[in-house]
Amino acid sequence: MDTDILKMQDREVFDAIAGETVRQMETLELIASENFTSRAVMQACGSVMTNKYAEGYPGKRYYGGCEFVDIAEDLARERARKLFGCEYVNVQPHSGSSANMAVLFSVLKPGDRIMGLDLSHGGHLTHGSSVNFSGQMFDARSYGVDRETGIIDMNKVEEMALDFKPRLIICGASAYSQGFDFKAFREIADKVGAFLMADIAHPAGLIAAGLLTDPMPHCHFVTTTTHKTLRGPRGGMIMMGKDFENPMGITIKTKNGPRVKMMSEVMDAEVMPGIQGGPLMHIIAGKAVAFGEALRPEFREYAVQVRKNAASMAERFTSLGYNIVSGGTKNHLMLLDLRNKDVNGKVAENLLHDAGITVNKNMVPFDDKSPFVTSGIRIGTAAMTTRGMKEADATLIAELIDRVITGAAESTIAATCKDVKAEIRSLCLQNPLEGYGVTP
């Protein structure tokens, strides 16, 4: 990328970017929520679109001069609808959390009841955690996974819903390696008169590629991030398979008298002006580019390889004696329970960092350690697959991770990390990130 001007004008920021570029090029990214965008996406995000304010929506802006940003947003919406087969989409949320906030605020009042997957069982902060707005503004109850299988027990979800009677049920996760039975969740939601929201931030790319169950026919609302397995810029999005009249009875005045607003109108108003002002048009342009890329046949090939790599890695970890929560993976990630390895998540994360491998410590179900220590690590294959790595590489990576973890208590661990880091660097340079070079 051309950074000559930045290098001359602000060497400190340039050096930080150059350092991060080298880190991404020469170390292995296994954080499940991270990926690498294309150069085209980065160019769109670094374009003159960043200069334009565009409060409102295409054709209905509060500012003039929006004819070209309107084109970009319309392209993003059109491509997202085609990619996910949805009738409604809003591409303006700044993040997945913003998207979730907009949905919750659009159908709930403070104190209303919600249900979501427990954070320590693989859920997300915005699904009802007590430290998040979702658990502070609303009465939240969490369902979890079975202690023995590590899989969500739908019978227990139904029992909880019938007892708690939530206004909204959330199905989705940030550290759950199995799929979601959206049909079963909808049946439960209908029994208690609840809205159903699917948060597909992690598997969105795999769903778009047709590899995992489609939530659109079953869920009232679907939210996602646009990075992770979608390989777009960091951002959020809200979708609905079908638009419908809002059941809250919100009306709008027309020349023929009041009419009930469609849910799409309510949602658009909740995003802007409800929780946001001006959209990030440079990011929306990047989203449009990423969605266009995801519509190509090569993207499905990529998504298939992501799952193959995850399956191969999980299989090797299991053969090496690791416990994978839920027993395996059906998507791009896995959660390793390290309690039988006498290493906590914090130590494992730090040692692997020294070995050139980036993961994140993560709580496991029924964890007795704090979120700052944890008993597990979360691993994902989306980013390594973008580099072109295949199943044999995934197997090798599992073996290299095992060398570090099993040697954690040895006096030679520093040397082990150094050796593994050299192997990882070689592997990364054999599978380069094209066009990411920055000259220090």
Curated annotation (Swiss-Prot):
Natural source organism: Chlorobium luteolum (strain DSM 273 / BCRC 81028 / 2530)
General function of this protein: Catalyzes the reversible interconversion of serine and glycine with tetrahydrofolate (THF) serving as the one-carbon carrier. This reaction serves as the major source of one-carbon groups required for the biosynthesis of purines, thymidylate, methionine, and other important biomolecules. Also exhibits THF-independent aldolase activity toward beta-hydroxyamino acids, producing glycine and aldehydes, via a retro-aldol mechanism.
Site note Plays an important role in substrate specificity, residues: 227
Oligomeric and partner information: Homodimer.
Modified residues (N6-(pyridoxal phosphate)lysine): 228
Protein name (Swiss-Prot/TrEMBL): Serine hydroxymethyltransferase
E.C. number: 2.1.2.1
Keyword Nucleotide-binding included in the entry's annotation: no
Subcellular location: Cytoplasm
